[in-house]
Structures are given as structure tokens and as C-alpha cells.
Amino acid sequence: MEAFTRLDAKAAPLPLANIDTDQIIPKQFLKTVERAGLAKGLFYDLRFDEQGREKPNFVLNRPEYKGAGVLVAGDNFGCGSSREHAPWALMDFGIRCVISTSFADIFYGNCFQNGLLPVVLKAEEVQQLMDEARGGNHVVSVDLEAQTVTSPSGAVFRFEIDPQRKDKMLRGLDAIGETLQSQKDIDVYEMKRALAQPWLEGA
């Protein structure tokens, strides 16, 4: 998993509450376990019309937000069914951080397992970021080490994060990476078990 330390990127405002995982990545794109290529399904029904043409007014289709790395979203982002494809699609599109006033619990946890940073700010702070992102300067700075978000105008907002999750994001550790940190202990255990219970070998 790619580590997250600091991000300076365009911010795209999506002032819609209760965006669920089916809106983030519709069910027809869930047939794969490959992460690459899921960007095409991100917000599909919001980004495209029935003929598959881009809707020019949707924020991520507008030229000034092309290449956005931060999404500033409405309340309760990521609600609905559990699907790890949701953070995968956001990441594949180039989004590394989502800022909202709240996230659904399962989506929030899935973000940390995939290198996508979910940031919770106060309602007035999220609104200010959205307002500023609609202006001419869209660049927002997210500093995980300092736990701050700096708006285009220079306003600094502090966010809270679980220390263990923060450490794993800074080091780029998902669940597998965290387990591999104990590889030596695992190897020692396997050797001892093989000596004590040789009949289990090859079972």
C-alpha cells in the first residue's frame, strides 16, 4: 500500500449528502477483484448519461477539476452496502483523500486498508473548503503528520485520527503489510510447531 504523508492537490466539491457505495461504484463494476480500471465506474450514474456520454456539469467532468486528488463531500459519505471497490475506484481515479463531516463506519475502515485518507471536519470547515474549491484556486494541502488541512486561502483546519491508523497510513501498511512486520516471529512459530507436531506437516 502506498504511504500517505502529505498531499497538495486540487479539491473537487461534491455537496451531496448520503452518497452511498452504489453511487460511488455501481454493482455492474463489482465483477472484478482487480483494482486497476475501476475509475471508469466511479460515480458512473452521476458522471454519464444513459448513452454513456459525460455530463458536462458534473464536477469531476469539468476541466478545472481534472486531476483532482481531494474530494470534499457531503455528510454521511460512503453509506450503504460494504464494498471495498468503493475506495478502490476513488484511488484508481486519482483521489487520495476524501473530506466530509462524517463517513459510514465500514467505508471509513476500508479507506485506511487501501491508502485513501478519510478526513472528518466540522460542517463550517467543510463548507468553507467547498466554497473555496469553487473559486479560481482549487489546491488544498492535507498533512497527515500534522493532522491539518490547509484551504486554498490559507485557513488551517485540524482533524482527529486514531493513532494506530495514522501510523499505518504514514508507513503504508495494510492488514497484510502489518502481518508481515511479524514475519520473523511467524517463522519461529512455524519451526517450533513443525518440531512439536511433525504429523501436521503436509496436512
Swiss-Prot record:
Enzyme class: lyase
Family annotation (InterPro entries): 3-IsopropMal_deHydase_ssu (IPR004431), Aconitase/3IPM_dehydase_swvl (IPR015928), AconitaseA/IPMdHydase_ssu_swvl (IPR000573), IPMI_Swivel (IPR033940), LeuD (IPR050075)
Gene3D superfamilies on file: Aconitase, domain 4
Single Gene Ontology BP annotation: L-leucine biosynthetic process
One Pfam family here: Aconitase_C
EC number: 4.2.1.33
Domain of life of the organism encoding this protein: Bacteria
One MF term in the entry's GO annotations: 3-isopropylmalate dehydratase activity
GO-annotated cellular components: 3-isopropylmalate dehydratase complex
Keywords linked to the UniProt accession: Amino-acid biosynthesis, Branched-chain amino acid biosynthesis, Leucine biosynthesis, Lyase
Pathways involved: Amino-acid biosynthesis; L-leucine biosynthesis; L-leucine from 3-methyl-2-oxobutanoate: step 2/4
Reactions mediated catalytically: (2R,3S)-3-isopropylmalate = (2S)-2-isopropylmalate
Alphabetized NCBIfam families for the sequence: leuD, PRK01641.1
Job of this protein: Catalyzes the isomerization between 2-isopropylmalate and 3-isopropylmalate, via the formation of 2-isopropylmaleate.
Subunit relationships: Heterodimer of LeuC and LeuD.
Family indicated by similarity: Belongs to the LeuD family. LeuD type 1 subfamily.
Protein name from the UniProt record: 3-isopropylmalate dehydratase small subunit
Source organism of this protein record: Phenylobacterium zucineum (strain HLK1)
